[in-house]
Regions:
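Extracytoplasmic/periplasmic solute-binding protein
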Residues: 144-157, 162, 186-233, 276
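Glycine-centered hinge/linker elements that transmit conformational signals in sensory
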Residues: 189-191, 232-260
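A structural signal for short loop-to-beta-strand junctions that line the ligand-binding cleft
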Residues: 98-100, 130-169, 310-314, 389-397
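Hinge/lid segment of periplasmic solute-binding proteins
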Residues: 106-161, 214, 299-301, 371
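Extracytoplasmic/periplasmic substrate-recognition and gating elements
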Residues: 174, 245, 249-255, 266, ...
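Short, low-complexity disordered leader/linker segments with a strong preference
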Residues: 1-44, 66, 127, 430-444
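C-terminal capping/gating helix-and-loop segments adjacent to ligand/active sites or protein-protein/ligand interfaces
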Residues: 378-431
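Extracytoplasmic "Venus flytrap"/periplasmic binding protein-like
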Residues: 62-137, 173-180, 270, 274-278, ...
Length: 444
């Protein structure tokens, strides 16, 4: 069986499983409608990153229970690596063990929507203080990830964003301006490289997670604003292929050879402990940079626009949010908790703790954001009406396979010169087009 056949079979199997689970969720398990309830009593909340986020959630819950003394929140921490399977298991067992409220990321939102596990929250948002207060690009990402054009199935709370990190001390020593255009980026990569002195202008990700960062660099340089052109992906558009060629040409010319196998942890460690001028990652590594380099030696900016005066083009990052589960017997109380957690004060508190971009625009002027310039710049770019966000198809059952393990070895071949950028893009595009066609067929 060839890889294309295996992938088609795997996608069909995944879709069949979702349809079967949907049928289960629509049976006599109590997950069809649930109840509004009295707006008081006990509700259950599943934290989708239990452990690292437990402390901040307990602070928010304490404040919520102070405001609503007739509501008690039962907090259940779920490890981030187990959360999707935990939801699936609860649905398959009948839905009664699902929480009232759960943390839901866009990477697996479509899976929950397909199984009928979540209530739409569009009308609830419109009838609440959240109306018009959530960053539009995050709302659009959640809507796209759910696989339905008109409904939101979670309230966005935070997002990450691709960031170009650079060593301000090395740039100052070389009398180079900030890499806020692609011309300045490539010039700095060249001028900061001294292989004999083990100094490099850039470090890239060639190991696990490599394709996600390549997509960031491709669409930011090409300026293409949509992942789809009709039913076909734009991934192998000639402008994206040209951008990928420029990106991979950096390998070993201005980057360490070890980049071939670097995952994010190795790449970030290499940047923080060596003489490397630039790194493309996301806001999540800011704490490490500051801890190891010092705040005065590091800066982070959004990836530059494709050309001077053009709008910035950003590839969507997974958006975290809160979902209202359909089986809840106390939706009124559950919604009070969601609205409270997404309010400006609580949303700011949560995102300050995790170092992410708050979804509520009311948090934009808080002191902690002003004191974290990379986060402030990311928030401003995401909230800029001119910014174009390329919505990745998280709703495709085979998206993770295609964009990760199935094609990461191929990306390494491109870096090594064993495969052309065009051949790589065409291969991935063919697989995505087939997955999209299969998904549309089952949408009926």
């Amino acid at each position: 069986m060839n890889p294309r056949t295996r992938r088609t079979t795997r996608t069909a199997t995944a879709l069949a499983a979702l349809l079967a689970l949907t049928a289960t969720a629509c049976g006599d398990d109590g997950s069809t409608t649930g109840e509004e309830g009295a707006g008081k009593g006990t509700i259950t909340f599943w934290d989708n990153n239990g452990g690292p986020r437990t402390k901040v959630w307990k602070r928010i819950i304490a404040k919520f229970e102070d405001k609503y003394p007739d509501i008690t929140v039962k907090y259940v921490p779920i490890p981030i690596t187990n959360v999707q399977s935990k939801y699936d298991t609860a649905i398959q067992s009948g839905g009664d063990s699902l929480p009232d409220v759960g943390g839901v990321g866009t990477a697996y939102l479509a899976n929950l929507v397909a199984q009928g596990a979540l209530d739409p929250v569009t009308d609830r948002i419109d009838d609440s203080a959240l109306k018009g207060k959530l960053i539009k690009n995050m709302v659009d990402s959640v809507r796209a990830a759910g696989g339905e054009d008109q409904e939101l199935y979670s309230v966005p709370t935070s997002a990450n964003q691709g960031t170009l990190w650079y060593r301000t001390d090395l740039f100052a020593a070389a009398k180079l301006p900030a890499p806020d255009s692609w011309e300045r980026f490539y010039k700095a990569a060249d001028e900061l490289t001294d292989k004999g002195g083990n100094k490099f202008g850039f470090t890239l990700r060639g190991g696990a997670g490599s394709i996600a960062q390549a997509l960031d660099m491709m669409y930011a340089q090409s300026g293409i604003a949509s992942f789809w052109d009709g039913d076909k992906t734009t991934l192998n558009d000639p402008r994206n292929v040209a951008a990928l060629e420029k990106y991979i040409a950096l390998f070993k010319k201005v980057t360490p050879a070890a980049d071939l196998n670097n995952d994010f942890a190795k790449m970030v460690a290499q940047f923080d402990q060596g003489d490397i001028g630039m790194l493309q990652h996301n806001l999540g590594s800011y704490v490490d940079h500051v801890r190891l380099l010092g705040k005065e030696k590091i800066a982070g900016i959004p990836l530059p626009p494709s050309r001077a005066g053009a709008p910035r083009t950003i590839v969507s990052n997974p958006v975290d949010g809160l979902g209202l589960f359909k089986a809840s017997k106390n939706k009124a109380a559950a919604w009070k908790f969601i609205a409270f957690a997404a309010s400006p004060e609580m949303n700011s508190l949560w995102n300050e703790d995790v170092g992410a971009i708050p979804a509520n625009v009311g948090a934009a002027d808080d002191d902690w954001i002003a004191e974290a310039p990379p986060t402030k710049a990311a928030l401003e770019s995401l909230n800029d009406p001119r910014t174009k966000v390329v919505q990745l198809p998280y709703y495709l059952p085979d998206w993770n396979n295609i964009s990760k393990a199935d094609n990461e070895p191929g990306f390494q071949k491109v870096l090594l010169g064993e495969m052309t950028a065009k051949a790589f893009c065409d291969k991935v595009a063919d697989e995505l087009n087939a997955a999209q066609a299969d998904w549309q067929k089952h949408q009926g």
